[in-house]
Amino acid sequence: MHTVAKDVKLQIEFNPSQVQAYRLIGYESRLLKDEDFNNDAKDAGEMGAGHSVTAFYEVVPVGVESNFVNKVDDLKYQKKVKPALQPTTGSKELLTVKLRYKAPDEDISKKLELPLVDNKGNNVSSDFRFAAAVAMFGQLLRDSDFKGDATYAQVIAMAKTALDNDEKGYRREFLRLVETADGLKQ
């Protein structure tokens, strides 16, 4: 591997006027403490030329009912403390991605920030659809509490929409694997 960046760290900040709750899917054991994001002494991952990283979040938009958003009664003996962070109302930004990395021969990191506006799922790439199908399959295999109403048929249908970039046949092999798992489950 030819390293192009070392100590690569990613931090996602969701806009509370758009998102009431979120959950990182996978990577639970690789979470970085907030204070370690800016700490150049804290080791993180390396990125090689041509490599990419994908992280999936389950997002509950503001105003959407969810069984996974905890509703807590007001406290009787304590006053509700005003949160330090206030939602940015009026902003169409869904989140901001913060990326920190060091060049291979440097010891001081650089930070990039990129806001993301929700496009309501329009123009989703086939790579994203395929990765989402793989993530859904993982939730089914683990029988995750968060799998919701997901089915093997949905995984297959989503993956089939993402077969256009499959020169080596890996995506078709994934489909066969899901079909086999579905057959074993029945």
Predicted regions and their residues:
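Conserved functional hotspot residues or short segments at active or partner-binding sites
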Residues: 65-178, 184-186
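Acidic, polar loop-rich interaction surfaces within structured domains
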Residues: 1-91
